[in-house]
């Protein structure tokens, strides 16, 4: 609750701090309203630094929030960035498969 208040009320400009907060919510939070806040932080992180790590976080959060269409779009973007920069996108590839299964009702 305190993290939500902090990140929603103060202008945080460090993309890594925003991403880390968002990722921790992905790992530990199921409350839809709080997930929406984390998605917002992740998107703010991407707006500051469009990188693999934070696009993957946003895609993961969108998947958890059951926004599969947008999650797939962002996951594919993250994977493209990883490939362009020689980063390992294995976890995002797994996420893409999970999103596709969810879209198909599996």
Name each model feature, range by range.
Residues 1-65:
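Alpha-helical adaptor scaffolds
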Residues 32-36, 65-73, 86-89:
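Structural helix-adjacent loops and short alpha-helical linkers that scaffold large soluble proteins
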Residues 49-56, 71-75, 106:
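Short, charged low-complexity intrinsically disordered segments located at boundaries
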Residues 73-106:
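Terminal, low-structured helical/coil segments at or just beyond the last alpha-helical repeat
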